[in-house]
Regions:
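Short, structured coil segments at secondary-structure junctions
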Residues: 178, 196, 203-204
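Charged helix-capping and loop-helix junction motifs
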Residues: 167-171
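Solvent-exposed loop/turn segments at secondary-structure junctions
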Residues: 66, 103-106, 160-163, 188-191, ...
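Acidic, Ser/Thr-rich peripheral helices and adjacent loops at domain boundaries
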Residues: 111-124, 201-211
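C-terminal "exit" segments of structured domains
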Residues: 204, 208-254
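Von Willebrand factor
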Residues: 53-111, 115-157, 161-166, 188-198
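Acidic, polar low-complexity linker/tail segments
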Residues: 2-61, 68-74, 90-92
Length: 254
């Protein structure tokens, strides 16, 4: 794992979303029926964006909040990450880089891997630790990697924002200008976090969906959809027959 440079925003840190696990357990479960609708919209939007370089191997940055309250979600993500590779046909390829933050200013990126077992080994050896969000570092790293070689999709999974939303929106806008879409998964129902995540998705021409641990099949479908987009663009995503995959098309601008 490679450490990422960066620093805390100090007085610019703005608390958004209760990261206390008890509070999230009692108030952070999406309404039944709402998740399916969000999944449908998310999948529809993804397929509306055409990849400019579908002839090359797709590259997907898989970023997760690994602070203490996120351990259950991290465990679920570990079990579901292989679904991303199942969406890729034999003639195509997908490279994934794991990026996570936790603790006091710790933000690390893995090497790029092209196999589910390699990614699983990287994720299994990591535990969650208390700390504030570092989404700004995620966006900055995505821009750096995108400058080296195009990233076709950034996936971010989190439940809170403890940084300046305006500063994050500016960084998201920079990624949008570079045609680097972010697909944001929100656990919980904090309306302020949702509004910010949706704005980041809009600015980058990406998409937003809820991350519902009680619906692993829908989450798997979402991951497959984004992976299909990253490796083959809109055409490969259209081949995905699942409802979530088709619904993701609706959000992405043409």
């Amino acid at each position: 794992m490679l450490p990422l440079a960066g620093h805390a925003h100090g007085t610019h840190i703005v608390a958004m979303g209760n990261k206390d696990p008890i509070a999230r357990t009692t108030g952070g479960v999406p309404r039944q029926g709402k998740v399916s609708a969000d999944v449908a919209a998310f999948v529809s939007k993804v397929a509306a964006v055409a990849r400019p370089d579908a002839a090359q191997d797709g590259r997907l940055l898989f970023a997760l909040d690994a602070t203490m309250s996120r351990q259950p979600t991290w465990d679920l993500a570990c079990s579901l990450q292989a679904e991303m590779f199942k969406a890729i046909p034999e003639e195509a390829a997908l490279q994934v880089q794991l990026l996570y933050f936790r603790g006091f200013g710790e933000c690390r990126a893995s090497k790029w891997v092209a196999d589910a077992s390699d990614l699983a080994r990287l994720m299994t050896g990591i535990d969650c630790r208390g700390g504030n969000t570092q989404i700004g570092k995620v966006f900055a790293h995505a821009r750096t990697e995108h400058g080296k070689r195009r990233i076709n999709a950034v996936v971010y999974v989190g439940d809170a924002i403890e940084e300046s939303v305006d500063e994050l929106a500016e960084k998201a806008g920079q990624l949008g200008l570079l045609n680097c879409p972010i697909f944001l998964f929100q656990e919980g129902r904090d309306s302020r976090v949702e509004a910010a995540f949706r704005d980041f998705a809009r600015l980058t021409k990406g998409a937003y969906a809820r991350f519902d641990a009680s619906a692993p099949q829908e989450l798997a479908a979402l991951l497959r959809a984004v992976a299909a987009y990253a490796s083959g663009g809109r055409d490969l995503l259209k081949v995905q027959g699942s409802g979530p995959a088709q619904a993701l098309l609706a959000q992405l601008p043409r």
